[in-house]
Regions:
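Beta-propeller blade termini
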Residues: 1-7, 53-60, 71, 113-120
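Acidic/hydrophobic-patterned starts of short beta strands in beta-sheet-rich repeat architectures
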Residues: 8-18, 62-73, 122-131
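Short glycine/acidic-enriched loop and turn motifs that connect beta-strands
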Residues: 19-25, 73-79, 133-139
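Short loop/turn segments that connect beta-strands within beta-propeller blades
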Residues: 35-38, 94-97, 153
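A short beta-strand motif characteristic of beta-propeller blades
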Residues: 40-46, 98-105
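Short coil/turn segments at the loop-to-beta-strand junctions that recur within blades
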Residues: 47-53, 106-112, 166-170
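Blade-level signature of beta-propeller repeat domains, shared across WD40, Kelch, NHL, RCC1
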Residues: 114-177
């Protein structure tokens, strides 16, 4: 779950991403954004193949409204039906109702690694770090890991409140603005 200000009111909102099925037959993931003020589901989708990484909240376009950054797996079938898995980062804007691919698919699968957003190099701009398992032919494997870095020119003021697993302070506490 990720917490942020996904609309223009002053009440924090919630974004959840969860697998559907019964273990070990978990195949697809569903997502929903719940308006914190009304309790209504304002966004619902099924993006990608099974993974349990948490979403984070970042104001990418600096308009005072957070977007969700979500690590998503998807599968591709070749001409003889062999599955390959790829991983990408998606940005979801609830203001524009857009889902935008931040990076092209990387071969591999991410079961449970949440992206991180903050100022890694202390230059005042947003950095994103995320990881992907390197085995593109099997899920639920941990036989290789690729750590990826994205540097941006998005200013880090104010600090993002939910830029990591369980929030930017890693304590599961969301501090209202």
């Amino acid at each position: 779950m990720g917490i942020g200000y996904f609309n223009k009111d002053k009440t924090p909102d919630f974004f959840v991403s969860f697998a559907q099925g019964t273990w070990p037959d978990l195949s697809w993931t569903k997502q929903a954004m719940i308006d914190g003020a009304t309790g209504k589901i304002e966004f619902s989708d099924s993006l990608g193949y099974y993974q349990t990484s948490s979403p984070i909240a970042v104001d990418f376009n600096e308009d005072g409204v957070d977007e969700v950054l979500l690590n998503v797996d998807y599968q591709v079938l070749d001409s003889i039906g062999l599955k390959s898995f790829y991983n990408t980062l998606l940005v979801i804007s609830f203001e524009t109702k857009e889902v935008v691919t931040l990076v092209e698919g990387i071969p591999g699968h991410n079961v449970a690694s949440t992206p991180w957003a903050g100022d890694l190099d202390n230059d005042g701009f947003l950095d994103i770090v995320y990881s992907v398992g390197t085995n593109q032919f099997k899920t639920y494997t941990f036989d290789g890991l690729r750590v990826n870095y994205i540097g941006t020119k998005i200013p880090m003021t104010p600090k993002h409140q939910w830029g990591a697993y369980m929030g930017s302070e890693y304590d599961g506490v969301f501090k209202k603005k």
